[in-house]
Amino acid sequence: MVQSKLINLDEIILTRTVNEFTTTLGIDSFAHCQDRDHYNSYTKFIVYKFNELGYRDEEWPENIDNCVWAIGDSFTVGIGQPFEETWPQLVQTKLQTRVINISMNGASATWIARRAKFIIDNFNPKTILIQWSYVHRREDPDASKLDEDRALPVDPLDVADFENLTANIMLVESIKLSTVVIHSFIPKFFDGENDLPKATVLYNMLDTSNILYFPPPDQADVARDGYHYDILTSTHYANSYVNLL
């Protein structure tokens, strides 16, 4: 990582997963999965290998000038999926361009926006692809905590959650400079039927602001854990991102 040697990367390290190697993770295990029959019948081999910064990705290349950056939560990490079938890897294959995955299990909109800001401020990338998380995920402002420990309890009735998501999207748009940013969202990111009208309001705002985005597809399949999406849905995301580039 020649280019990054002059940049302090401590801010973005996920301490708990630095160089971790495991075949199960979180709810992607027999003990914690959503459907044990599905888990046992899943035939694809899965390994979780994290790089020296704590992300499920290869180590950064020597030159990152032309790299595409992917930011998201556990769906972008690819929980329950083989690494090569995650949407960032599918985009990499389609574009024949290195995609660097900067995603965290449980990431909030604020965390995603902070990562985008760090990348823009330090690397001035050509392209960032974002998959925003659940509306109701919020982050503890206490920056002394590890990122993995900053998730706040979910309150589905907190009307400020939607405003928080919108504010973070607009923050990224306001600082992107020449970077092309494409936004999308995890399936059912609104996390409840009562938020469906808000999603429509959000899409209208993005359209009015000429922001590059696409609505999330319906989840067409499930990964080994019985919760996250698998190859059919990740392929839909990958195609949609590439089509907007």
Locations of regions flagged by a protein language model:
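Surface-exposed cleft-lining segments at the edges of enzyme active sites
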Residues: S74-I79, I102-M104, V135, D147-T166, ...
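Short, well-structured alpha-helical segments in soluble
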Residues: A113-N124
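A conserved mid-domain beta-alpha-beta active-site/ligand-binding segment of alpha/beta enzyme cores
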Residues: R138-L177, I182-D191
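Serine-esterase "nucleophile elbow" of acetyl-processing enzymes
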Residues: V47-N105, T110, F118, D230, ...
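Catalytic His-Asp segment of secreted/periplasmic serine-dependent ester chemistry enzymes
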Residues: F185-L245
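Short catalytic/ligand-binding loop motif for oxyanion handling, primarily in non-cytosolic enzymes
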Residues: V77-G80, S108-T110, V135-P141, K188-N194
